[in-house]
């Protein structure tokens, strides 16, 4: 299998971000490479399977594909019209079913297409290659037969998923066999390895160690997930080193493998950034938001599907901002636009009163200059207004304050009982998420009748309580606590009377309700400094002594960035969300505004993979730390879950049997 030579790793060459490399490989290395000889000026058919069509859609637009000479996109398993004068590009998984369909298309006297350029998404077996070579009628019609080694969804400029939506159930559930769990991990390992094959990176592989791995202790399959995944990835990388031309032979980056047990609170706590709140509160389908546009003629309002994604500059600027900050910036943008328009100024003077954001929105829409740019601005003003209404209607400020106080040890059981007894307007989901956080910090409070009493007080169903009880399957903060100094686990603050599972980071409290931070933030910073304890996070390979030399760049960057962030306060900022003080220049989102910073001076990449689903707050952390550490931090996971999705998945879990070391196969 051939593989083109492109220097995209962080150890040399022009630096491009993760999604950019993915996109360029698909468009140029695959689609454009099929433009050979006499076929240069002709249109082609692109044939994909259910997985590869998603890979393509996450990385490229249809216009990009068309520009590379593709006039038609087809599903390999659907009946297709013969186009014998056209060439076909196959981007498919290397499965027996796909190969059979390909041979059916191209064999015999009347093939569907003139020539076939075949690109497999991951390594293909010798058996399947042999199966293709056996058909003598097909061989002359093959223009290329290659491994792209690209089998992941690039969901963000610094994020990918392996499309294992049921990983939590398959790996943490009781009903699933260890064989099914192993199969899931094997595919996962192969797909993660294609990330490194694509970027031409060879990582130092570190992973969360099993909590008790000795001859006298029983351990569970779920506790060995990072260990087994690390071994699987390592095996795949060893093959890539031998088969891929110019693949690095020494470490060029770092990979840290974790699972959802590392932080059970991040998936359910209310996150207050614009991006997270949109996906949490607006019932969006993926990144699609249904925008209702009032009719200018007084008729029925128009419904329009819009995508909230990186191509939208306003979304890109605001997605990691606190909702109060985002609302304020949108108001400022609208005001600035109107200040440049004389007709709008006259209208404002006639009314005499201060204009609300909604008034500004209506005025802008009535202006003759109303354009696509203002349409985008109006869209985000509407979204922010809707979010702020929901925050008020659902009493999320009070709930959010209690959640964060619980996490930081400033509140306890009495405060939760008081809240459940007095806040009758609180939503069912809000109370459920509160109890899930409580169960992580105080698991003993849900034993026996105690759990039943809390369920009655919160007026939750037994189905809801299944999610609460299943938090224990991910390991509670209490169970995870280790006595070793510098350990990775959730630690208690001895200075507080109540139990705390996060240490205060004063620089993080730029806005109220933004104290919480995901555990991976602390882990990534320790990894970058070389301070992760080896007993908790062993390494599959011992990197060369010079490997950590690149981290000196990150420490220099840290010292040069220690400037206080500018306060965004004004008379319009709600009192509940006002900034609480200065920070280190990274906190609120001053760094995130410049997330598309110059990558050319970046150090070695850091990859973090979380089995069991990642959160938007964790993705935000990776953007933030990339600028702080001067190293591109890429988050991978089995899926990207918003709180409702995570709760649904958690309800599917049941207790798992213990696994003896004799049964362990790594």
UniProtKB/Swiss-Prot annotation:
Q: Which GO terms describe its biological process?
A: cytokinesis by cell plate formation; protein transport; vesicle-mediated transport
Going by the entry's taxonomy, the superkingdom of the source organism is recorded as Eukaryota
Coiled-coil annotation reads: 340-377
Tissue specificity of this protein: Expressed throughout the plant, both in mitotically active and quiescent cells. Enriched in dividing tissues.
Is the Membrane keyword given for this protein?
yes
Lipid bilayer topology: Peripheral membrane protein
Keyword field contains Membrane: yes
Example of a GO cellular component annotation carried by this entry? cytosol
The family database entries (InterPro entries) matched by this protein are listed as: Sec-1-like_dom1 (IPR043154), Sec-1-like_dom3a (IPR043127), Sec1-like (IPR001619), Sec1-like_dom2 (IPR027482), Sec1-like_sf (IPR036045)
Among Gene3D superfamilies, the record links this protein to: 1.25.40.60, 3.40.50.1910, 3.40.50.2060, Syntaxin Binding Protein 1, Chain A, domain 2 (3.90.830.10)
Subunit structure of this entry?
A: Binds the syntaxin KNOLLE. Interacts with SEC6.
Q: What does this protein do?
A: Regulator of vesicle trafficking involved in cytokinesis and root hair development, but not required for cell elongation.
This protein's name:
SNARE-interacting protein KEULE
What organism does the UniProt record list as the source? Arabidopsis thaliana (Mouse-ear cress)
Gene assigned in the entry: KEU
């Amino acid at each position: 299998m051939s593989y083109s030579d492109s220097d995209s790793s962080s150890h040399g060459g022009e630096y491009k971000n993760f999604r950019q490399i993915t996109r360029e490989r698909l468009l140029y290395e695959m689609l454009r490479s099929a433009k050979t000889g006499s076929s240069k000026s002709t249109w082609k058919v692109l044939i994909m399977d259910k997985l590869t069509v998603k890979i393509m859609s996450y990385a490229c637009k249809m216009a990009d594909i068309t520009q590379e000479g593709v006039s038609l996109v087809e599903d390999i398993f659907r009946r297709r019209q013969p186009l014998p004068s056209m060439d076909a590009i196959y981007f498919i998984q290397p499965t027996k079913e796909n190969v059979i369909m390909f041979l059916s298309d191209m064999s015999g006297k009347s093939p569907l297409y003139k020539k076939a350029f075949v690109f497999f998404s991951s390594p293909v077996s010798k058996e399947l290659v042999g199966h293709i070579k056996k058909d003598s009628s097909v061989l002359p019609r093959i223009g290329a037969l290659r491994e792209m080694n690209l089998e992941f969804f690039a969901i963000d400029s610094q994020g990918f998923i392996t499309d294992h939506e049921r990983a939590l159930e398959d790996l943490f559930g009781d009903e699933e066999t260890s064989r099914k769990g192993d199969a899931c991990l094997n595919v996962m390992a192969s797909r993660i390895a294609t990330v490194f094959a694509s970027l031409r990176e060879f990582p130092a592989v570190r992973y969360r160690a099993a909590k008790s791995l000795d001859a006298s202790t029983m351990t569970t399959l779920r506790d060995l997930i990072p260990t087994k995944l690390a071994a699987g990835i390592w095996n795949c990388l060893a093959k890539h080193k031998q088969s891929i031309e110019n693949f690095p032979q020494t470490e060029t980056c770092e990979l840290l493998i974790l699972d959802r047990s590392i932080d059970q609170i991040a998936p359910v706590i209310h996150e207050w950034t614009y991006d997270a709140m949109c996906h949490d509160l607006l019932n969006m389908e993926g990144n699609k938001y249904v925008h209702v546009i009032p009719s200018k003629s007084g008729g029925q309002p128009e419904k329009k599907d819009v995508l909230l994604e990186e191509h939208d500059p306003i979304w890109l600027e605001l997605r990691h901002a606190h909702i109060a900050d985002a609302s304020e910036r949108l108001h400022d943008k609208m005001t600035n636009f109107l200040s440049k328009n004389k007709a709008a100024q006259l209208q404002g003077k006639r009314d005499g009163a201060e204009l609300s954001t909604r008034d500004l929105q209506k005025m802008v829409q009535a202006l003759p200059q109303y354009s696509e740019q203002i349409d985008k601005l109006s869209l985000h003003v509407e979204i922010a207004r809707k979010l702020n209404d929901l925050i008020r209607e659902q009493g999320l400020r009070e709930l959010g304050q209690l959640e964060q106080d619980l996490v930081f040890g400033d509140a306890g059981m009495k405060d939760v009982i008081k809240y459940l007894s007095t806040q009758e307007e609180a939503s069912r989901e809000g109370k459920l998420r509160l109890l899930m956080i409580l169960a992580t910090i105080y698991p003993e409070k849900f034993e026996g009748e105690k759990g039943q009493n809390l369920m009655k007080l919160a007026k939750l169903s037994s189905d809801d309580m299944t999610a609460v009880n299943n938090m224990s399957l991910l390991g509670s903060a209490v169970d995870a606590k280790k006595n070793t100094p510098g350990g990775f686990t959730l630690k208690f603050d001895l200075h507080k009377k109540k139990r705390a599972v996060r240490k205060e980071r004063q620089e993080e409290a730029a806005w109220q309700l933004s104290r919480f931070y995901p555990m991976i933030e602390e882990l990534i910073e320790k990894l970058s400094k070389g301070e992760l304890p080896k007993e908790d996070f062993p390494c599959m390979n011992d990197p060369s002594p010079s490997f950590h030399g690149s981290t000196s760049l990150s420490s220099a960057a840290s010292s040069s960035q220690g400037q206080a962030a500018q306060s965004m306060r004004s008379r319009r900022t709600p009192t509940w969300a006002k900034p609480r003080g200065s920070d280190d220049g990274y906190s609120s989102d001053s760094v995130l505004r410049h997330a598309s910073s110059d990558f050319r001076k970046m150090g070695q990449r850091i990859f973090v993979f979380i089995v069991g689903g990642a959160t938007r707050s964790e993705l935000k952390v990776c953007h933030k730390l990339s600028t702080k550490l001067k190293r591109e931090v890429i988050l991978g996971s089995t899926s990207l879950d918003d709180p409702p999705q995570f709760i649904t998945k958690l309800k599917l879990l049941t207790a798992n049997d213990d696994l003896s070391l004799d049964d362990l196969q790594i």
